[in-house]
From Swiss-Prot:
Catalytic residues identified in the record: E208, E307
Keywords: Cell wall biogenesis/degradation, Disulfide bond, Glycosidase, Hydrolase, Secreted, Signal, Zymogen
GO biological process assignments: cell wall organization; glucan catabolic process
InterPro entries in alphabetical order: Glyco_hydro_5, Glycoside_hydrolase_SF, Glycosyl_hydrolase_5
Swiss-Prot/TrEMBL catalytic activity: Successive hydrolysis of beta-D-glucose units from the non-reducing ends of (1->3)-beta-D-glucans, releasing alpha-glucose
Gene Ontology cellular component terms for the protein in this record: cell surface; extracellular region
Protein's name in the database: Glucan 1,3-beta-glucosidase
Disulfide bonds: C290-C416, C315-C343
Subcellular location: Secreted
Role noted for this protein: Beta-glucanases participate in the metabolism of beta-glucan, the main structural component of the cell wall. It could also function biosynthetically as a transglycosylase.
Leader sequence segment: 1-20
Length: 426
């Protein structure tokens, strides 16, 4: 549903009139006002990321042009790519995962999906077939009492140039027909899944559109248009990402006074993707997590931290891109000016093999983040599982006792209520 910018207020009013939607939030299957979202991302399932599943990319570990799902499918060709990916889709996440997710006290999963699963664009190398597995995921969630947020994780042209958009490099999302094709994908996603209101509580219009390389006014117009697309199918909540801006800067946009309803703001909080962040000591990581309360609590719409992690370094194998090193130990090209520690036991391995001090630091960090992010609507940890990145592996961190069970228990209560450093040895 495309609206000329000048007609946005009228279009929103018309959509509300046609659907008989009052401006206040309608009752949904999940009470975002009074319940906390506690969820995990099912990363690496339908949008490949080399660091989550390095085995899929291992044949190009020593060089080559394959660095993301676009180049992966282009290199293999559609037939071979489908064979390999279909096996991956069938095995990476199963019904047993959903059962364990529910057993850990979580109530949501966030499922990243690329546009290519929904809309085929000529000359794209991507393959289709993901939706039958998404259908299964919805059924598994229903069976296990879980809710689902569907997340359009990759847009044509790439909305951020990251490998997690499907294609690394230039940001070209707002060129040509890319935005209209993204809206086609949203429409297809909404038509297929929004009616399943007992399970699908929200549709995220686009993951991490960059505020650089894109026109912010066009991002905002896209959000209105995408909201209109979802509203043709009912009252499912619509999630918008903050485009890496201060969440408070979105106050007044797409709230009830603006004539829209059921909008969730998504912010992602990592402390590993800059030199200054990886240089921080464990106490500084905790304090930074707690300081996020001041940014998310004053927002005027439901606000979730849709991605966060236990990692305090960027050591995980290929986290910065296939074949690339880390800022933390000075091995990332162009970021060799500092050395803050060894990536031993952090580059790859298991939670059990982590150093005791790293386990302790992670446990304190995770508990502080849980306290901070539940100051508003809730959170989704990134990610449920990885092949070899222990600090990012919710399943194994929880099994090892480093993420609390139940989720509201604390080894160290009220870390965000004191200015003192409570992390041992710091």
């Amino acid at each position: 549903m495309l609206y000329p910018r000048a007609l946005l207020p009228a279009a929103v009013a018309l959509a509300s009139l046609v659907l008989a939607v009052p401006l206040e939030e309608r009752q949904l299957a999940f009470d975002f006002n009074n319940q906390k979202v506690r969820g995990v991302n099912l990363g690496g399932w339908f949008v490949l990321e080399p660091w989550i599943t390095p085995s899929i990319f291992q044949q190009w570990a020593n060089g080559g042009d394959v660095i993301d799902e676009y180049s992966y499918t282009a290199a293999l060709g559609k037939d071979e790519a489908f064979t390999r990916l279909n096996n991956h889709w069938a095995t990476w996440i199963t019904e047993e995962d959903f059962a364990e997710i529910a057993s850990m006290g979580l109530n949501h999963v966030r499922i990243p999906i690329g546009y290519w699963a929904l809309v085929a664009i000529p000359n794209d190398p991507y393959v289709q077939g993901q939706l039958s597995y998404v259908d299964r995921a919805i059924d598994w969630a229903r069976k296990n009492g879980l809710k689902v947020m569907l997340d359009l994780h990759g847009a044509p042209g790439s909305q951020n140039g990251f490998d997690n958009s499907g294609r690394t490099g230039t940001i070209a999302w707002q060129s040509g027909d890319n935005v209209p094709n993204t809206l086609r994908a949203i429409q297809a996603l909404a038509e297929r899944y929004a009616p399943q209101t007992d399970v699908v509580t929200a549709i995220e219009l686009l993951n991490e559109p960059a505020n650089w390389g894109n026109d912010l006014s066009q991002i905002k117009k896209f959000y209105y248009d995408g909201w209109g697309n979802v509203r043709t199918q009912g009252q499912t909540a619509v999630t918008i990402h903050d485009a890496f801006l201060d969440p408070r800067s979105w106050n007044g946009f797409m709230n009830s006074e603006a004539g829209v309803n059921n909008v969730i703001l998504d912010t992602h909080i990592y402390q590993v993707f800059s030199q200054n962040e990886v240089a921080m000591k464990p106490c500084a990581h905790v304090q930074t997590a707690c300081s996020s309360i001041d940014k998310i609590k004053p927002t005027d719409k439901w606000t979730i931290v849709g991605e966060w992690t236990g990692a305090q370094t960027d050591c995980a194998k290929w986290l910065n891109g296939l074949g690339k090193g880390a800022r933390y130990d000075g091995t990332l090209p162009g970021h060799s000016e500092g050395y803050y520690g060894s990536c031993d036991k952090k580059y790859e391995g298991t939670v059990d093999s982590m150093l005791p001090v790293d386990k302790t630091n992670l446990q304190y960090f995770v508990e502080a983040q849980l306290d901070a992010y539940e100051s508003h609507t809730g959170w989704f940890f990134w990610t449920w599982k990885t092949e070899s990145a222990p600090e990012w592996h919710f399943q194994n961190l929880t099994r090892a006792g480093l993420i609390p069970q139940p989720l509201d228990s604390r080894k160290v209560p009220s870390q965000c209520g004191t200015s003192q450093c409570l992390v041992p040895g710091n």
